[in-house]
């Protein structure tokens, strides 16, 4: 079986050959735990959980190390703790616990290691000292900064010309910087802020050095795959590469860099000002999106229907379609025993996590090999048990008829054919089906008692 992944560093799809097949090593940037995670963060969690599952399937579950960090020292954390009047550790512990609930709700496996930044100060200080000793970092007014010209091919990951990056960095450049692109490795901490003793005084780390330190501690100086959202390519991942390569002297930090695409909500960029900022916790536990709660399996399948590198429009309609698909699959597989995933399904995932093609293969298995359908869903991390219980009490033919009528009514509503919509509602009511048109546009249903 040959795995092929798109490498952001080379801008091409490449055959994947791990450094050590008995110890495949993956790092993905985890959350900064100051608030609930939004659904864009959820996409990253699902994508790299699927990668973890696929690698475990290919190399064995005991031969893959997946590290996903927790950033628990950050200016946003300090500000939120002060705003709420709570201790920083109380805030980060609370948000980490909610994050774990959300990740589990999306069907994500725990990573092999989940390091916290605050537990890796010694590693951060050690890397910074290496950079100073090698002339790649300098001390200025209590700060330690990375000297970007020390990295000749800085910008190789983002493919940004250096002049463009310099132009973008010229706004309010700190006077202690030698160059506008230089970035902070260590900075002084105010008495009211968290701080750690270092050779350069009491302070705290910059964001980028945290991931370099944690990946080094748990995966080594060079590892197989580094991942995250596309928004992290620059500056975060670019800076990680620069400081890690300069500290350890290797030509690469990770052999493959994988990034998932952007997410928008109902056709618009997600933002609090637009009122379309959607958190994972809200989707799983409240009726704030589409007027109802959504099972984690529905959220996961809705994400996986779009290839991970493509932008995705997260909509109520997409969730409804994913739920209908899962309901059909559950009825098709009722009474079947799980089997090994189908070879064509595995081939699809092996081709740069081609989930749209993999899902198409599952549709083909629905009638002829329901056990293989279950095996494929298990590998995708989609749990049919997440769905509600309403359709379990129905014969398959009755369930399919109900779903078809609901879909017809939805089409009538979209075309503002209210008479047809009412006719279909009445027909469903005669079958004992009660519809609820929720405030966000989603339609839910239940059987009359």
Swiss-Prot record:
Belongs to the class-I aminoacyl-tRNA synthetase family. Its EC number is 6.1.1.16. One of its GO terms (molecular function) is cysteine-tRNA ligase activity. GO terms for biological process: cysteinyl-tRNA aminoacylation. A motif ('KMSKS' region) lies at residues 269-273. Its cofactor is Zn(2+). This is Cysteine--tRNA ligase. It comes from the Bacteria. Its main location: cytoplasm. Keywords: Aminoacyl-tRNA synthetase, ATP-binding, Cytoplasm, Ligase, Metal-binding, Nucleotide-binding, Protein biosynthesis, Zinc. Monomer. It catalyses: tRNA(Cys) + L-cysteine + ATP = L-cysteinyl-tRNA(Cys) + AMP + diphosphate.
């Amino acid at each position: 079986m040959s795995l092929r992944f798109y490498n952001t560093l080379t801008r091409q799809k490449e055959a994947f050959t791990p450094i050590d097949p008995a110890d495949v090593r993956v790092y993905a940037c985890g959350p900064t735990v100051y608030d609930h995670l939004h659904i864009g963060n959820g996409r990253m969690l699902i994508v790299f959980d699927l990668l973890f599952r696929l690698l475990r399937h290919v190399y064995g579950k005991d031969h893959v190390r997946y590290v996903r960090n927790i950033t628990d020292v950050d200016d946003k954390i300090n500000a939120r703790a002060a705003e709420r009047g709570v201790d920083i550790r109380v805030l980060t512990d609370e948000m980490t616990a909610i994050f774990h609930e959300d990740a589990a709700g999306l069907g994500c496996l725990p990573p092999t290691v989940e390091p916290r930044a605050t537990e890796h100060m010694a590693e951060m200080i050690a890397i910074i000292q290496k950079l100073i000793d090698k002339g790649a970092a300098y001390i200025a007014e209590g700060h330690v900064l990375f000297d970007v010209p020390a990295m000749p091919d800085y910008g190789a990951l983002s493919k940004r010309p250096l002049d463009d990056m310099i132009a973008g960095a010229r706004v309010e450049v700190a006077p202690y910087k030698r160059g506008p692109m230089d970035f902070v490795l260590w900075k002084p901490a105010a008495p009211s802020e968290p701080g750690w003793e270092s050779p350069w005084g009491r302070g705290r780390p910059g964001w980028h050095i945290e991931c370099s330190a944690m990946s080094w501690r748990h995966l080594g100086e060079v590892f197989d795959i580094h991942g995250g959202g596309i928004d992290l390519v620059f500056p975060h991942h670019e800076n990680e590469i620069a400081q890690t390569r300069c500290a350890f002297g290797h030509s690469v930090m990770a052999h493959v860099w994988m990034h998932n695409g952007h997410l928008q909500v109902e056709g618009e960029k997600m933002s609090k000002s637009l009122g379309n900022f959607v958190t994972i916790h809200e989707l799983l536990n409240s009726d704030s999106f589409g007027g109802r709660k959504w099972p984690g399996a529905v959220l996961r399948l809705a994400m996986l229907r779009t290839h991970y590198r493509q932008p995705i429009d997260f909509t109520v309609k997409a969730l409804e379609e994913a739920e209908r698909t899962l309901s059909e699959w559950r009825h098709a597989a009722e009474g079947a025993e799980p089997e090994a995933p189908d070879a064509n399904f595995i081939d699809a995932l092996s081709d740069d996590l081609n989930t749209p093609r993999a899902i198409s293969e599952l549709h083909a298995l629905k009638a002829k090999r329901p056990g293989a359908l279950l095996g494929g869903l298990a590998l995708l991390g989609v749990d049919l048990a997440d769905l509600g219980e309403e359709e379990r009490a129905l014969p398959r033919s009755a369930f399919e008829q109900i779903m078809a009528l609901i879909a017809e009514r939805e089409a009538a509503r979209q075309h503002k054919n209210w008479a047809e919509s009412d006719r279909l509602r009445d027909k469903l009511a005669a079958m004992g089906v009660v519809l609820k048109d929720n405030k966000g546009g989603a339609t839910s249903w239940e059987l009359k008692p």
